[in-house]
Every structure is written in structure tokens, then in C-alpha cells.
Amino acid sequence: GQTRLGRAGKPFRLYKFRTMRIEECDESGLNQSVGNGARQTRVGRLLRATSLDELPQLWNIIIGDMSVVGPRPMVEGQQAAGRDYREVVPYYDFRQLMPPGLSGWAQANGLRGSTQEYGPAKRRIDHDCAYIQNFSLALDLKIIVRTFIKEFLTGSGV
């Protein structure tokens, strides 16, 4: 697992299946995997393409570190366009008012994966903030359905 930021910025251990070659693994989580990079194992590519590498996060939900829906947990010092998210998006910490989720509004709208540019990073945070401002059971159900279709049925995992 990797250390991620939870509610109120509290660090927690995020559980995932290993999809990278051990010798090329980045335990910090700052070096994001891009596409089908050479660091991924053959099985790892399949797990990531179907998002099955996320299944161990059900344990994070059971022990209270995460919820089913909420902003996806990020690594401390996560970067976008070579700069810390907090520099790129000044209201970044607003997303930590809720526990992180297995899926979120940004992910359900296709905003996931590596963020090498400012625009996608800001859109991701904007979606997280919109989720918090419009939190409801109906929105959670919409996110769960969209995530299931996008990640598991169409295999759009990154």
C-alpha cells in the first residue's frame, strides 16, 4: 500500500494490488503510471484496465479510512504540471472535508490517471469540490452506476 491523505489531511495506508514490477515500484506514489508503461506487469495491466487493482480498498472502507464515494485520495505532495496541487489549485484542501472514496465525481466523469497539465488537474479538483457542495444519496448512486459502467464494463481504467 501507499500513504495517502484522508479526511482533514490525515495520512492513511491505501491498499491496492501491486501492478508494477517490484524493482520499478515507487512507494511514495508521486511517480504516476502513464498508460501501459513498462513498469506494469502483464497481470498488472489487466488489473488496472479493469480497475480490479482497487478492490483491496474495500478494506479501507471497512476500517473507516475511506467511503464508497468521495474525492479520490491523493498522495501528499501530488503534482500537476510539475507543481504541488496546492500551488496549482489554491482551494485544493476543500476536497479533504469528506473522507476519500473508492470512486468520486471526477473519476465518474473520466478525470483520472496522470495529471501532467494544469487544466485536467484543476478540473479534477473542481469536480471533487462540486461533489462536496452537492452531496446527496442520489448523486452517490449516480457516481456508483457511472463508475461501474466506465471502469468495469468498458474497461477504461488507467
Where are these regions (language model features)?
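Conserved small/aromatic sequence motifs within transmembrane helices
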Residues: 1-158
